[in-house]
Amino acid sequence: KEIASVSFPMSLSSIFGALNRNIDSMTVVRGLKNFMSEEAAKIQYGILSGKVETLVTIPMSFNMAFATALVPAMSKATAKGDIKTVEKRIKFSILVSILIGLPCMVGMILYAKQILLLLFPNAASGEFIYQISCLGIIFILIEQTVGAALHGIGKVFIPAIALAIGGIIKLILNLSLVPINNEIFLLGGTAGAALSSVICHAVVLTIELLVLKKQLKLKFEKRKFIIKPLIAVLTMAI
């Protein structure tokens, strides 16, 4: 029973995560066909799913080690009732995610064209889509860590619920934005699909973070978690 109570919600999270990733495959080509040929629509979708999304997920591999290690450490501290250790480990892991995510996000946005030309020369036209997608990196990485923390403290259904809500919002935005010609509206077409993914991850993170803060009464120092990382990243960018 204990194994099932943990594995079932984790499976739900994986299912909803997979469904969210497949929303584009179900809606993008169909929406793009409103203002371009099917062949051109498939090419645009290929740039979004095959090139852009591949590059955006690279920073996740660096952050995954911290998120994975957090679950058993959190479970052990929670079982002992050591709330201070729980809070300390969560805050440290979130800070690490920020310090990984922000430089990756800014660097990829600034050098989007060069990265695409180097790795995928045929997809250089996807620069703007890539830049929009990169905005979601910081949300994805912190979402990984916060989701792991929620599993660690026993709130295993929250990530699945958050992903379901985020997926619904992404589907609505895809159906609304993708059919719009991006020559008429800059954030239409595949740019709309990229933006909907960013908003989806932002919504998921917001829900998870609100629950985590409510459960543990976490307080994040603005100077440490926002101001200093932003100053460092802006200095790097300049």
Model-assigned labels for residue ranges:
Residues 1, 157, 167-205, 238:
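Membrane-interface helix-loop junctions in multi-pass transport and translocation proteins
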Residues 14, 224-238:
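Transmembrane alpha-helical segments of multi-pass transport proteins
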Residues 3-4, 49, 82-99, 103-111, ...:
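Interfacial transmembrane-helix starts/ends
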Residues 9, 16, 41-63, 95-96:
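Alpha-helical transmembrane segments of polytopic membrane transporters and translocases
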Residues 135-165, 175:
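Membrane-interface junctions at transmembrane-helix termini in multi-pass inner-membrane proteins
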Residues 60-80, 84-87:
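Helix-loop junctions and terminal segments of transmembrane helices
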Residues 91, 108-138, 187:
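Interfacial segments at transmembrane-helix termini and the short loops linking adjacent helices
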Residues 146-155, 208-226:
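Alpha-helical transmembrane segments
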